[in-house]
């Protein structure tokens, strides 16, 4: 692609004011886009709107600075039709709630005018990060999605050591391990299901978590050869970095490659261009499609530009 061509790149994300620029994948992607002289239009959820059949947003042109004190500067605010953009990066973090779903409808209207949306709005709706794993039964451990407390109790009695988690959260939020004879079983399950009014996911505990909960990144169907093995603190079940876990960079194992290569064609077909797989041992546990992280951790230790791979894809796709 000619260096003279500047794309109009929109990004929809949570407040840039509250990010950690040393670890934030969205910030890393935007830095790469800025380095390539693309024009960045920053948006938050409140900025999106639909007027008749047309998608609009109040955007702010933004300049990024790699400075831990002040890392961004808004240059100009304007209301535009999203059809004026070349690409929109949907990087809004969960919760995956009705507001998130509504935003994908608006983005889909922009997509229908020819704007490239990463990841594809319809697939963001269809591919819940927890439930989507059930489309690949050979890759996952025994998994129950229910809001029925009796079914959860039966599952617990069978395995005697289980993990229960919500379907719409991130970063290890509200994940519980329930061991054999845990006196708190009832109160945990009642709260997780909101007294049988809310679905959750239940899985047997995987002891391989002690070796790390691996985050494997895939760009346009191509697995990154290194992953981040997130290891839980002593006394903690959750290995997520957001929950205090320690991240170690390691090469993909043979099993990791098999899982990633098996999933890649489906992800690519669905327009899921930037994806993070979570793997414990040899089991797939989540398929992160909303705003996958761990780009910075890998790039800081390995001679690879994951953000560069993503921007290469965008430039090639838009300029075909």
From Swiss-Prot:
Give the enzyme's main class according to its UniProt record, as a single word.
ligase
Task: Report the residue ranges that make up the ATP-grasp domain in this protein.
Answer: 130-315
Q: Show the stretches that span the lipid bilayer.
A: none
List the GO cellular component terms: cytoplasm
Q: Which domain of life is it from?
A: Bacteria
Q: Which reaction does it catalyse?
A: gamma-L-glutamyl-L-cysteine + glycine + ATP = glutathione + ADP + phosphate + H(+)
The pathway it acts in is:
Sulfur metabolism; glutathione biosynthesis; glutathione from L-cysteine and L-glutamate: step 2/2
The protein here is known as Glutathione synthetase
Q: Which family does it belong to?
A: Belongs to the prokaryotic GSH synthase family.
Question: Hey, what's the signal peptide range on this chain?
Answer: none
Q: Which residues bind ATP?
A: 156-212
**Cofactor(s) needed by this chain:** Mg(2+); Mn(2+)
Q: Where does Mg(2+) bind?
A: 286, 288
Q: Which gene encodes it?
A: gshB
The annotation note on the cofactor reads:
Binds 1 Mg(2+) or Mn(2+) ion per subunit.
**Keywords recorded for this protein, A-Z:** ATP-binding, Glutathione biosynthesis, Ligase, Magnesium, Manganese, Metal-binding, Nucleotide-binding
Checking NCBIfam families in the record gives: glut_syn (TIGR01380), PRK05246.1 (NF003573)
The GO terms this record gives for MF are:
ATP binding; glutathione synthase activity; metal ion binding
Q: State which Enzyme Commission number(s) the record gives.
A: 6.3.2.3
| ATP-binding found in the keyword field | yes
Species classification: Bacteria, Pseudomonadati, Pseudomonadota, Gammaproteobacteria, Enterobacterales
């Amino acid at each position: 692609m000619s260096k003279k061509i500047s794309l109009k790149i929109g990004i929809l994300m949570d407040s840039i004011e509250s990010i950690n620029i040393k670890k934030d994948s969205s910030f890393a992607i935007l830095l790469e886009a800025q380095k390539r002289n693309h024009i960045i239009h920053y948006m938050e959820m409140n900025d999106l709107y639909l007027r008749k059949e047309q998608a609009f947003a109040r955007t702010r042109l933004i300049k990024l600075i790699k400075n831990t004190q002040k890392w961004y500067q808004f240059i100009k605010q304007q209301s535009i039709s999203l059809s004026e953009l070349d690409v929109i990066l949907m990087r809004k973090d969960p919760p995956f709630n009705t507001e998130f779903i509504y935003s994908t409808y608006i983005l889909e209207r922009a997509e229908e005018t020819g704007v490239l949306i990463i990841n594809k709005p319809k697939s963001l709706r269809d591919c819940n990060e927890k439930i989507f794993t059930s489309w690949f039964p050979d890759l996952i451990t025994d998994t129950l999605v229910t809001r029925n407390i009796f079914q959860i109790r039966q599952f617990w009695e069978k395995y005697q050591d289980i993990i229960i988690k919500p379907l719409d959260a991130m970063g290890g939020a509200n994940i519980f391990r329930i061991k054999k004879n845990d006196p708190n079983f009832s109160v945990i399950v009642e709260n997780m299901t909101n007294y049988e009014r809310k679905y959750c996911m239940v899985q047997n505990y995987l002891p391989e978590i002690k070796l790390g909960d691996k985050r494997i990144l895939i760009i346009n169907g191509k697995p990154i050869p290194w992953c981040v093995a997130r290891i839980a603190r002593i006394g903690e079940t959750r290995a997520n970095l957001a929950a205090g876990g320690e991240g170690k960079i390691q090469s993909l194992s043979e099993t990791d490659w098999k899982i990633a290569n098996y999933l890649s064609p489906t992800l690519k077909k669905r327009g899921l261009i930037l994806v993070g797989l979570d793997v414990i041992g040899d089991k797939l546990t989540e398929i992160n499609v909303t705003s996958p992280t761990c780009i910075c951790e890998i790039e800081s230790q390995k001679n690879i530009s994951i953000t560069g791979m993503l921007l290469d894809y965008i430039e090639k796709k838009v300029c075909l």
